[in-house]
Every structure is written in C-alpha cells, then in structure tokens.
C-alpha cells in the first residue's frame, strides 16, 4: 500500500480518536501505583475508552487478547495485562489505541511507579526528549529519515540502545500503514528501505523505544511480550502526529 494522504476533515476525526487516547492514558497514569494489577489497568482502559464513545483498537488486533499493551521494566512493548501487581520503582509503559468513526489514534507513555532510580529517570527523560525532537523534525520537505535521526541525536550521547526491531508507522483507517518510521538514521536502515519526503496530510505514529543497555530484544513464549535481551529497563513514548503546512500537529495531545 502507498502512503495515504488525509484531508483536513479526516485529520479532525483522527484528532477525536487521539484525544480519547490521551484522556485514557491520563486516567491510567493517575492510578498506576504500587499494588494495582495490570488486569485492573486494562479494565479501566476499556471502560474509559468506551465511556467516551470510542472502541479499543488493540483487542483482537492480530489476535492480541487484551484492550491495552502494558509493559513493565525490561518489557519493551506488547506486554499482555495479567495478574502482575505494580511495585514501587517499576517503569510501566502504557500503549493504547482508540477508534472513532473508523479512524485510529495511538499513543504511549512511560509512567514511573512510586520512587524510581535516578538511572531510570534519566532513561525516561531522554526517551521523552527524543520524541519531542522527532516531532520538531516533522515538517514538509524533510524526509522520514530526519525523524529517526532526531531521535538518534538525543539518545546516542546517553549511551542508551535504540530498539531496531520495532519502528513507528503510518496510521489512519488502519492502525498500521506505510511508511515505516525507524527511530534511527538511514545509516542503520535496511538497504532499499523507502525514505519518502514528508507532505501535508501524512499522519504518523512516532514511537521511540529506548533501552538502558543493548538495543537487542527478544520475544517471550507468549508470542507477544518483547523484552530487552540484557534484562535492563526500557522506556517508550509515542504520539500520533499530522504533518501540516504549518508544521506538526500532535493528535494525541491534550485538548
């Protein structure tokens, strides 16, 4: 499939979905405290999404069994909520999608549980800053590679590992569309990977996944949960962003 350019009206519908995602992540962030189970967070995600007239995007997607992806500590992405309780010092990654009138929004954030270590805080801050830098690069005329280069420029001085096996993506009527959006510059890309110019109407889900140690990851036996190969922490932030003539517009931000 080629890159689908969205109209102003379509981007407005995606903003509706994005606002639901933002508000639900806000609700979850408030209650992500020691003692709560991941299943309880999943139930809140379902309730709060549906209460806003939207549907949860991830349940059943490629067979995913829950409403939201929740990954803790060395879990990078695609964690399946269960009976695990959050503990003081955990890093919990909340990755949520919502659908409104057939249009998707997708965002993620890393939430400190209780008091986290200075090293963990540095990882969280750098990952958030790398997403902010990526968003600033999303102007017409730049290329997709400029997004990843912006992430890499923030992360590499810290010595953290940028996950290479999973990348950002286009989004719209489908949760995953072209193009792929790596979180690193083109020197690390697969030979021949498309590197289109950014045009008004492109909507991308940009999501740096940053590890405290190695960039290498592996998938657990459940077929979903991705963890760091060295067992160290990982952080993840994501926004759905529209490229416009006036610059980037974050569709999963606050009202």
What are these regions (language model features)?
Residues 1-255:
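Active-site neighborhoods and metal-handling regions in enzymes and metal-associated proteins
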């Amino acid at each position: 499939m080629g890159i689908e350019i969205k109209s102003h009206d379509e981007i407005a519908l995606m903003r509706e979905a994005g606002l639901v995602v933002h508000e639900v992540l806000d609700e979850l962030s408030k209650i992500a405290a020691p003692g709560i189970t991941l299943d309880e967070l999943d139930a809140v995600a379902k309730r709060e999404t549906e209460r806003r007239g939207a549907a949860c995007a991830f349940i059943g997607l490629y067979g995913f069994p829950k409403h939201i992806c929740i990954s803790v500590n060395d879990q990078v992405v695609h964690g399946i909520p269960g009976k695990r309780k959050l503990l003081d010092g955990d890093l919990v990654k909340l990755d949520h999608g919502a659908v409104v009138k057939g249009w998707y929004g997708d965002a993620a954030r890393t939430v400190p549980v209780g008091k986290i270590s200075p090293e963990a805080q540095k990882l969280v801050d750098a990952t958030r800053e790398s997403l902010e830098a990526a968003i600033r690069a999303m102007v017409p005329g730049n290329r997709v590679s400029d997004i990843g280069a912006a992430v890499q420029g923030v992360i590499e001085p810290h010595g953290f590992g940028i996950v290479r096996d999973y990348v950002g993506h286009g989004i719209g009527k489908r949760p995953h569309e072209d193009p792929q959006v790596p979180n690193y510059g083109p020197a690390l890309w697969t030979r021949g990977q498309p590197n289109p110019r950014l045009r008004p109407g492109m909507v991308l889900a940009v999501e740096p996944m940053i590890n405290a140690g190695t960039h290498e990851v592996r998938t657990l036996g459940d077929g979903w949960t991705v963890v760091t190969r060295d067992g160290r922490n990982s952080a993840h932030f994501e926004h759905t962003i529209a490229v416009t003539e006036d610059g980037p517009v974050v569709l999963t931000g606050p009202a």
